[in-house]
Amino acid sequence: MAGTEELKRKIRVVKGRPLKVNIRAAQMEDAGRLAELSGQLGYPGSAGDMRRRLRHLLADPEHAVWVGETESGIIAGWIHVFVKRLLENDPEIEIGGLVIDENFRGQGAGKVLVERAEGWAKARGLKSVYVRSNVVRNDAHAFYQKLGYRIIKTQSSFRKTFC
C-alpha cells in the first residue's frame, strides 16, 4: 500500500477525472487498505485484524471479496459477498460489506462492485442478492434503491458478546 501522503496525492489526481475502476479479487497485500476503508464507515480494525479475516474468507469458496482499483492503483472500495444458506429459504447471495472511499463516492465504483456481486450470484444459479443497511445510512439506502433493490423489512439486531 502506498504511504499516506502518496495516497493523498494520487487521490487528488484521480478526483479531477472520471473514475474508472478495475475489479479484481482481493489479495492479502490489500489488508491494510481494506482496514483503512472499513474505518471510514465506523468499523475500525488493524491491518493484522483484516489479514486474519481475509485469510479465512479467501479460502472459502462460498465467500468472495473484490476490490475496485483505479487506473493509478488506488483501491477505491471493496465488497464482500457470501452464499447465505438458511433452512427456511433458498440460498441467496448476501452483501456482507461494501465500502467506497469517501473521496470516490458517487462516481460509479459502488455500482460496478455490486454488479460484480450480482454476476457472481447469477453464475451460481441463485436468484437474489440480499443486503442489510443501517437505518441511519440514508445515502446507502438511496444507492441500493437506485440499483433496483427494495426495502423488504426493518428489524432490530441483537448481539451477545462473550469475553
Where are the language model's segments positioned?
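Acetyl-CoA-dependent GNAT
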Residues: 25-91, 96, 101, 114, ...
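Conserved functional loop/turn residues at catalytic and ligand-binding sites
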Residues: 61, 97-99, 103-104, 108, ...
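Conserved beta-strand-loop-alpha-helix junction that forms the acyl-donor binding cleft
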Residues: 131-140, 159, 163
